[in-house]
Amino acid sequence: MARKRQQQQKRPISSSITKRRVMLFGIIAIIAAGIGAYGYKSMIPVNGKAPAFGFPANHFIKATSSANSGYFYVSQSSGSVRGLRGSGGGGGIVNPTYTFQKGNLQSIHVINEDYNTHSHHNFNIDAFNVHTKDLGYFETQTMTFVPNKTGTFEYYCSIHPEMKGNIIVEGE
């Protein structure tokens, strides 16, 4: 009996347990690498090649329409927000003009709230390679970019040309 116990104690760890541990470690490593790659890619602005570390300025804009005014963008920020100019009625500024500083990270959050017509809308700034997909009713998309040149640039909806405004980028 004592001999059997000694033999059992000297046996190497089962190879199936070792294989399972190695496979589990490999799966965890692959998942961690995938999450890391996704996180790295999500930090790259649409007009950049390297990740931008820091917090962007956030701008909220909704696409909508009315029977009287047609299609338009409305800011979701109050008029006192730095970087926002324009005039308009309702709950925000209609087709607002945004003012950014060159080199500062910006995020534009677009939502289609066109309840009246349920039309698709998009948001484009060609100068900075900012293009959303065609958004259906109540769909959203966020685009993060760095304004890397000064001047006045137009943003617009390619589906409804009357939906447009300006972005002014000032020097550093």
Regions found by a protein language model. Give the residues of each.
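Extracytoplasmic copper-binding redox domains, predominantly the cupredoxin/blue-copper superfamily
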Residues: 2-172
